[in-house]
């Protein structure tokens, strides 16, 4: 800390101002404000962050000392003002808590009561954010013995004013000789660390991480130092290196990483104007700019900043893991420790952990840097890697060069890992944490910490990739197989499971570069296969899977799966059942590893339907595609069998069906046709709208809620329906719109509740939905109010340019309207209102919400059921949609892109 810094705080000038004022409050406030401005300017000018936070602590020391002098403390030997916690370490950020302990010698301290109260009142009046406690030395000992947080705070203390001897006495009575011996303290701190990590999902890669509390955050470094202080009395990282727990290079890395997080935290406090440690979307752009990250694309600048953040916290996490394991080996050592068991000439087990037999193993036999992970996969009883061996791995990573990568011993070992029955994900994760994976596969190293600034991808690319491999592995476990029965069944019968793991490793490896990441990844995958001398068939499959890993989900979510041509085109693209099996399993794992909330019953049903229909097409033969007429005949025949068994007159059925049109039978299965037909035939002629609701437990819709509406056609039918559903808090995931020749509308919606689940067995909720829709459709002139819901905080920060594309389908007499835009409450209801205003008919719709974005496809016609052909009409339609999409967006949102 500085001894003198007149620009920051001039004691003489301050005391002169105090003498001139009747009340000291104004002088104190002025000094604090001016010093804060100086420190913020120095931060913007790039002043050393360590110096800045020490300077702020020095400033507060001076302010507190001057405030202390304003009062008569009588017997000054019996009281002391002590800084504890972070302030006790001499570290203060702009809005950090100033933790104070007023330490008393005797329990009887009535003589100080009035001065203490007035002193604390002054601190609050001048705007200091203080946390204070008033204790005697004996009370400190009593509370420290009972509370881990209290003893931790007291270990980090400085006397600001009063008797230093009191603090020394406090340290003596709270030492390891009296309480919290180092072993007990270490176990408590380790448990505290694990609980804190679990609170933040045990990952360094949260979208909005906490720079203090998240894994790899500042609290991890502090935990290591607390344990070291309790065990060895070391005060800082440099001293920790002196004890042999850190190499000098590791000390420098940890210190620079801490400095980076200090800069981020300082900027957070400064921008938020309060003690804010969460790196929220609200602040990421501003902090990126403040710290010098720039790009023509602001989103890219944020991604660069966050990638640096994630890499820093990963480094901290790795080094703290290393130190904590060292502590375990030293502090927890007992008489039974030291048992070793040989594994091979290079490795042995030491108390259940693998270790190198000597310090030269990796230097003499570099292939051992891969062998160690294969051994752990082959011996699942191994608990982990000894700290010294982790350090040896880190020290010898530089030996992994092109010669190493092309050595057949190493390529064989790497492939061997993927053939192990268990431990693939766990050991790939270890390889990534120790920096081996990114060295062996430089293309993987590029995606470490690579984030995508959106709500769809909640993990960095490397974390997502390893999560995908974890999901693939879990598909073989019974609890998971019950949730994903088809994917689990297929995973169990893949001829070479290692190929899907390798495809998963490379599927997103091209992200963060210019160009199509699927194509870039396929190029990298091909080179990998060649370098590892994989058979030609294996290589072709891996490359094809990487290149096409998005095709199945895109087709399922954006195409009309009831159209035989869509199925036939997809089957032609896939080519054979083996590829289909691999692609389906990879797609399921990819979606679940991207964002768990994306996997809902409706998305599952779409993929399962596409898989089943494609499999049938492949077995029938691509030269014999199922045509529309054949599909209609099959559906009608099966539905009629159901109805006749239930006692329905076939003639009544035939008469009804003659009015429904071909599209109806193409878009519904036999069970639904029978369900609809039975209800329609029983509906009185003047019974009003027919609204049917059921849990769609059929194979293709399992778990969703299907709403079928049959009513006389009216111009505003879709607009009224979606507005009413918005009022009912329903999310529409699919819409099938059909108008019969008798001018009746037959609409089917697949909906989920706002929480992503189906309606379930909830008669009250079903009645609420049925009554709400019936009332809205019975009185369409009372158009349901589009509820103005608050845009969620996170959505506000993702204003990307909306895209509106209008094109005509050469094979079908419809116009396709594609909309990609930021998600906003009530958006679909607003689009429905536009269709009403433009006199448009909706024939079909595919609705998809992916994080903060919607990707919706509408199949529309004009009032005469013809495709849109007037360019001016299309232009006006686009403009109207654009206005709705941009309503409420931030002014810096990019222009909307329209295509026709």
From Swiss-Prot:
PROSITE patterns: ACT, HD
Domain ACT: 706-784, 816-900
BP terms from Gene Ontology: regulation of nitrogen utilization
Family, per entry: Belongs to the GlnD family.
Top-level taxonomy: Bacteria, Pseudomonadati, Pseudomonadota, Gammaproteobacteria, Pseudomonadales
Domain notes: Has four distinct domains: an N-terminal nucleotidyltransferase (NT) domain responsible for UTase activity, a central HD domain that encodes UR activity, and two C-terminal ACT domains that seem to have a role in glutamine sensing.
Highest rank taxon of the organism: Bacteria
Protein name: Bifunctional uridylyltransferase/uridylyl-removing enzyme
HD domain boundaries: 461-583
Matches recorded under HAMAP family: PII_uridylyl_transf
Functional note: Modifies, by uridylylation and deuridylylation, the PII regulatory proteins (GlnB and homologs), in response to the nitrogen status of the cell that GlnD senses through the glutamine level. Under low glutamine levels, catalyzes the conversion of the PII proteins and UTP to PII-UMP and PPi, while under higher glutamine levels, GlnD hydrolyzes PII-UMP to PII and UMP (deuridylylation). Thus, controls uridylylation state and activity of the PII proteins, and plays an important role in the regulation of nitrogen assimilation and metabolism.
Gene3D superfamilies: Beta Polymerase, domain 2, cca-adding enzyme, domain 2, Nucleotidyltransferases domain 2
Provenance organism: Pseudomonas putida (strain W619)
Region (Uridylyl-removing): 343-705
SUPFAM superfamilies the record matches: ACT-like (SSF55021), HD-domain/PDEase-like (SSF109604), Nucleotidyltransferase (SSF81301), Nucleotidyltransferase substrate binding subunit/domain (SSF81593)
Activity regulation statement: Uridylyltransferase (UTase) activity is inhibited by glutamine, while glutamine activates uridylyl-removing (UR) activity.
């Amino acid at each position: 800390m500085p001894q003198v810094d007149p620009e920051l705080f001039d004691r003489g000038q301050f005391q002169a101002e105090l003498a001139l004022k009747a009340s000291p409050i104004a002088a104190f406030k002025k000094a604090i404000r001016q010093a804060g401005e100086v420190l913020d300017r120095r931060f913007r000018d790039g002043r050393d962050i360590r110096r800045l936070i020490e300077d702020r602590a020095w400033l507060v020391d001076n302010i507190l000392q001057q405030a202390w002098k304003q009062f008569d403390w009588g017997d000054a030997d019996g009281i002391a003002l002590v800084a504890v916690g972070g302030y006790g370490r001499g570290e203060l950020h702009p809005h950090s808590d100033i933790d104070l302990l007023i330490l008393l010698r005797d329990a009887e301290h009535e003589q100080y009561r009035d001065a203490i109260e007035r002193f604390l009142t002054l601190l609050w009046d001048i705007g200091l954010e203080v946390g204070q406690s008033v204790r005697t030395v004996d009370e400190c000992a009593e509370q420290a013995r009972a509370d881990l947080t209290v003893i931790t705070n007291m270990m980090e203390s400085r006397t600001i004013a009063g008797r230093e001897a009191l603090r020394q006495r406090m340290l003596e009575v709270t030492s390891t000789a009296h309480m919290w011996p180092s072993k007990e303290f270490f176990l408590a701190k380790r448990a505290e660390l694990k609980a804190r990590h679990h609170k933040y999902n045990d990952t360094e890669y949260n979208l909005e991480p906490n720079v203090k509390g998240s894994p790899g955050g500042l609290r991890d470094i502090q935990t290591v130092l607390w344990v070291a202080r309790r065990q060895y009395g070391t005060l800082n990282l440099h001293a920790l290196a002196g004890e042999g727990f850190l190499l000098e290079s590791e000390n420098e890395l940890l210190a620079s990483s801490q400095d980076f997080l200090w800069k981020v935290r300082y900027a957070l406090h400064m921008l938020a104007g309060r003690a804010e440690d969460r790196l929220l979307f609200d602040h990421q752009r501003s902090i990126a700019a403040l710290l010098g990250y720039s790009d023509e694309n602001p989103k890219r600048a944020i991604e660069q900043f966050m990638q640096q953040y994630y890499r820093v916290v990963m480094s901290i996490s790795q080094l703290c893991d290393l130190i904590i394991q060292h502590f375990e080996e030293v502090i927890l050592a007992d008489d039974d420790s030291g048992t070793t068991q040989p594994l091979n000439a290079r490795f042995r087990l030491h108390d259940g952990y693998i270790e190198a037999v000597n310090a030269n193993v990796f230097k003499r036999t570099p292939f051992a840097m891969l062998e160690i992970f294969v051994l752990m996969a082959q011996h699942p009883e191994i608990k982990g890697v000894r700290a010294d061996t982790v350090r040896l791995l880190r020290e010898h990573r530089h030996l992994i060069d092109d010669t190493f990568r092309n050595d057949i011993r190493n390529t064989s070992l790497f492939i061997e890992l993927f053939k192990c029955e268990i431990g693939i994900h766990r050991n790939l994760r270890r390889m990534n944490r120790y920096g081996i994976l990114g060295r062996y596969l430089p293309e993987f190293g590029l995606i470490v910490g690579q984030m995508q600034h959106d709500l769809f991808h909640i993990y960095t690319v490397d974390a997502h990739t390893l999560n995908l491999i974890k999901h693939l592995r879990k598909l073989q476990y019974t609890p998971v197989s019950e949730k994903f029965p088809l994917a689990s069944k297929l995973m169990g019968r893949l001829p070479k499971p290692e190929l899907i793991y390798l495809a998963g490793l490379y599927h997103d490896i091209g992200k963060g570069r210019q160009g199509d990441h699927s194509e870039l990844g396929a190029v990298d995958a091909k080179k990998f296969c060649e370098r590892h001398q994989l058979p030609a068939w294996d290589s072709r499959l891996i490359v094809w899977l990487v290149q096409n890993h998005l095709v199945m989900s895109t087709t399922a979510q954006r195409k009309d799966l009831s159209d035989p041509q869509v199925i036939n085109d997809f089957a032609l693209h896939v080519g054979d059942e083996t590829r289909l099996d691999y692609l389906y399993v990879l797609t399921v794992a990819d979606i679940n590893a991207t964002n768990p909330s994306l996997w809902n019953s409706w998305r599952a049903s779409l993929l399962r339907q596409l898989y089943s229909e494609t499999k049938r097409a492949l077995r029938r033969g691509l030269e014999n595609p199922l045509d529309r007429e054949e599909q209609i005949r099959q559906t009608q025949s099966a539905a009629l069998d159901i109805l006749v068994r239930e006692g329905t007159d076939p003639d009544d059925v035939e008469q009804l069906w003659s009015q429904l049109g071909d599209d109806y039978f193409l878009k519904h299965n036999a069970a639904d046709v029978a369900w609809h037909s039975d209800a329609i035939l029983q509906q009185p002629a003047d019974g009003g709208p027919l609204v049917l609701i059921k849990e769609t437990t059929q194979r293709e819709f399992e778990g969703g809620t299907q709403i079928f509406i049959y009513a006389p056609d009216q111009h505003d039918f879709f607009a009224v329906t979606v507005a009413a559903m918005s009022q009912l808090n329903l999310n529409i995931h699919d819409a099938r719109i059909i108008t019969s020749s008798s001018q009746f509308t037959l609409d089917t919606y697949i909906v989920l509740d706002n929480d992503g689940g189906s309606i379930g067995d909830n008669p009250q909720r079903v009645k609420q939905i049925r009554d709400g829709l019936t009332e809205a459709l019975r009185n369409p002139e009372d158009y349901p109010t589009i509820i103005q819901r608050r845009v969620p905080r996170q959505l506000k920060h993702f204003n990307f340019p909306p895209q509106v594309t209008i094109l005509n389908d050469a094979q079908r007499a419809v116009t396709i309207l594609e909309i990609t835009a930021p998600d906003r409450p009530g958006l679909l209801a607003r689009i429905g209102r536009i269709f009403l205003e433009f006199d448009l008919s909706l024939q079909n719709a595919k609705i998809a919400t992916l994080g903060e974005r919607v990707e919706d496809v509408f199949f529309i016609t004009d009032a005469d059921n013809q495709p849109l052909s007037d360019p001016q009409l299309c232009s006006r339609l686009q403009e109207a949609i654009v206005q709705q999409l941009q309503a409420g967006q931030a002014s810096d949102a990019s222009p909307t892109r329209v295509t026709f």
